[in-house]
């Protein structure tokens, strides 16, 4: 603006800046009144959003499917409710790969000379669900990175995989890969009525001690439970 006011992106930063402008007498009165008006509008929007979230929580309180999905880290109330409302019967997808592809979080494939190359994600399908999955993936990735920095000895198997993936391909690609994994696991949870268990892979590996890791990765989603998918993640 003509007053050189710059506001960083982010709801918290905007609220903080508006409060600063409102109380800064270095700016004209009309600028401070405008900041107050905008701050009040933001407050009203916050109240409406909070009421919408409470309404969704009331509607989903007794929904066992929503409860199962929320057991998966990275899947919150809004994401679980949106998945249930949008996907419907997950059995319409042959496997978890198809479900992830329907959200546009699988890489494009193109071949030349008998070789297959993977490109950027397709970005097809429901953009809102894709956004929710990616945001959830970012949350769990950030949590894993913070834990790796402060208490690396407490990382679990899946968090260690996330940290290594982030080091190998970078933050944004890692987040999309994690979102893809979440989508495949959500498909398994929906079709089998399973609750997520981060340690379930231990029982699965004990029962399949003679199966090499490569066989796990080559198996189809129809042959894998959420426990096996967790084991295949690493």
Feature-to-residue mapping (PLM):
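A detector of single, family-specific signature residues
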Residues: 1-234
């Amino acid at each position: 603006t003509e007053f050189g006011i710059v506001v960083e992106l982010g709801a918290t930063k905007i609220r903080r800046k508006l409060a600063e402008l409102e109380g800064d007498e270095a700016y004209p009165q009309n600028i401070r009144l405008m900041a107050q008006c905008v701050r009040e509008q933001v407050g009203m929007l916050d109240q409406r959003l909070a009421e919408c979230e409470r309404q969704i929580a009331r509607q989903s309180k007794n929904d066992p499917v929503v409860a199962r999905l929320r057991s998966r880290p990275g899947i919150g109330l809004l994401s679980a409710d949106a998945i249930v409302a949008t996907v419907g019967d997950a059995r319409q997808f042959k496997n978890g790969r198809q479900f992830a592809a329907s959200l546009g979080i699988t890489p494009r494939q193109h071949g030349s000379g008998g070789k297959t190359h993977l490109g950027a994600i397709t970005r097809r399908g429901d953009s809102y669900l894709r956004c929710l999955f990616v945001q959830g993936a970012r949350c769990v990735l950030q949590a894993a990175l913070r834990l790796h920095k402060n208490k690396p000895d407490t990382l679990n198997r899946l968090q260690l995989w996330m940290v290594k993936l982030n080091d190998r391909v970078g933050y944004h690609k890692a987040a999309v890969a994690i979102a893809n994994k979440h989508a495949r696991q959500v498909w398994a949870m929906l079709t089998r009525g399973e609750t997520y268990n981060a340690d379930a892979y231990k029982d699965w590996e004990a029962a399949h001690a003679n199966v090499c890791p490569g066989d796990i990765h080559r198996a189809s989603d129809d042959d894998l439970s959420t426990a096996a998918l967790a084991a295949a993640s690493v």
